[in-house]
């Protein structure tokens, strides 16, 4: 473990993330513009794709970071039997959920039960599929539905706020099962589906279209919210949530229904709306991507 990763264990995660939240919403013109210009320069942000391409038009850093895209800039795969990529970013890992375990990096894994905070819920994904998508600071930070789904429940799992950058993922054991996260359960035509919004260092919040700000949700207990009977349906490709800074979304899919798109591998750059998986009846190859051991 290198010095930087070791340091992340010692940092006051909550204090830093709280400070980041206040700064992100600051509307002082000098402060917000310095932050916006710094991020654009450091991470090579492409504002030509944004609905508002003028970097000076955003009232706060958070408004810039959660910016919308131009209409039609990310056309979704038109095949209704294709599950869509939920976000812009880069594949961290993807593949089968073997013996209830989700691969994180070479020599690192965690259980679906740890991730979801619920043994019964995790059992629905035994021998299913997962995909972990990392959103860097340069990416579009809204998460969209891979397919039409009915919201069943959410689970807020408190935890740490480690960085979720590539170095941290390789070196911090069970990272995604230790960080604070919001687990969103849906019923879909493909069966049960879970989207996990993972918090991280300096992430000032996670918002959903149905509940507003879900993280931070201070406390040390797992919190369940039941949405059955409230008829909250979100259409395929519609926005379902957004990060107020870069982080990670993990998709869990049931067994024997879908096969992951064969061109996807770890570290693949991905865009919102491209194919993530195909229904097995489409006669695609069922071979899962190879993972490092």
Curated annotation (Swiss-Prot):
It is found in: Cell membrane. The modification Pyruvic acid (Ser) is found at residue 247. It is a peripheral membrane protein. GO terms for biological process: phosphatidylethanolamine biosynthetic process. One of its GO terms (cellular component) is plasma membrane. Its cofactor is pyruvate. The record marks 246-247 as: Cleavage (non-hydrolytic). One of its GO terms (molecular function) is phosphatidylserine decarboxylase activity. It comes from the Bacteria. Pathway: Phospholipid metabolism; phosphatidylethanolamine biosynthesis; phosphatidylethanolamine from CDP-diacylglycerol: step 2/2. Its EC number is 4.1.1.65. Keywords: Cell membrane, Decarboxylase, Lipid biosynthesis, Lipid metabolism, Lyase, Membrane, Phospholipid biosynthesis, Phospholipid metabolism, Pyruvate, Zymogen. Its main location: membrane. Is synthesized initially as an inactive proenzyme. Formation of the active enzyme involves a self-maturation process in which the active site pyruvoyl group is generated from an internal serine residue via an autocatalytic post-translational modification. Two non-identical subunits are generated from the proenzyme in this reaction, and the pyruvate is formed at the N-terminus of the alpha chain, which is derived from the carboxyl end of the proenzyme. Binds 1 pyruvoyl group covalently per subunit. It holds the Pfam family PS_Dcarbxylase. The keyword Lyase applies. HAMAP family: PS_decarb_PSD_B_type1. Catalyzes the formation of phosphatidylethanolamine (PtdEtn) from phosphatidylserine (PtdSer). Belongs to the phosphatidylserine decarboxylase family. PSD-B subfamily. Prokaryotic type I sub-subfamily. Heterodimer of a large membrane-associated beta subunit and a small pyruvoyl-containing alpha subunit. This is Phosphatidylserine decarboxylase proenzyme. The gene is psd.
């Amino acid at each position: 473990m290198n010095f930087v990763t070791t340091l992340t264990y010692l940092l006051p995660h909550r204090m830093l993330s709280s400070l980041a939240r206040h700064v992100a919403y600051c509307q002082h013109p000098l402060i917000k513009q310095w932050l916006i210009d710094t991020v654009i320069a450091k991470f090579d942000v492409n504002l030509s794709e944004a609905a508002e391409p003028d970097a000076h038009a955003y009232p706060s850093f958070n408004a810039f970071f959660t910016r919308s895209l131009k209409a039609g800039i990310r056309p979704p795969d038109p095949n209704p039997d294709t599950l869509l990529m939920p976000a812009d970013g880069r594949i961290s890992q993807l593949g089968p959920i073997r013996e209830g375990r989700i691969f994180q990096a070479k020599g690192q894994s965690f259980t679906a039960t740890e991730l979801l905070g619920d043994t019964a819920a995790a059992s629905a994904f035994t021998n299913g599929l997962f995909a972990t998508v990392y959103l860097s600071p340069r990416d579009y930070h809204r998460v969209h539905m891979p397919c039409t789904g009915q919201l069943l429940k959410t689970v807020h799992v408190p935890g740490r706020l480690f960085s979720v950058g590539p170095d941290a993922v390789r070196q911090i054991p069970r990272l995604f099962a230790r960080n604070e996260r919001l687990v969103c359960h849906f019923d879909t035509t493909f069966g049960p589906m879970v989207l996990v919004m993972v918090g991280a260092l300096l992430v000032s919040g996670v918002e959903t279209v149905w509940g507003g700000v879900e993280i931070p949700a201070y406390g040390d207990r797992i919190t369940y919210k039941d949405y059955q009977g409230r008829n909250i349906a979100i259409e395929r490709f519609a926005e379902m949530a957004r990060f107020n800074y870069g982080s990670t979304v993990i998709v869990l899919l049931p067994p024997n229904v879908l096969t992951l798109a064969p061109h996807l591998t770890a570290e693949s750059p991905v865009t919102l709306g491209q194919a993530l998986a195909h229904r097995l009846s489409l006669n695609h190859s069922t071979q899962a991507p190879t993972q490092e051991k």
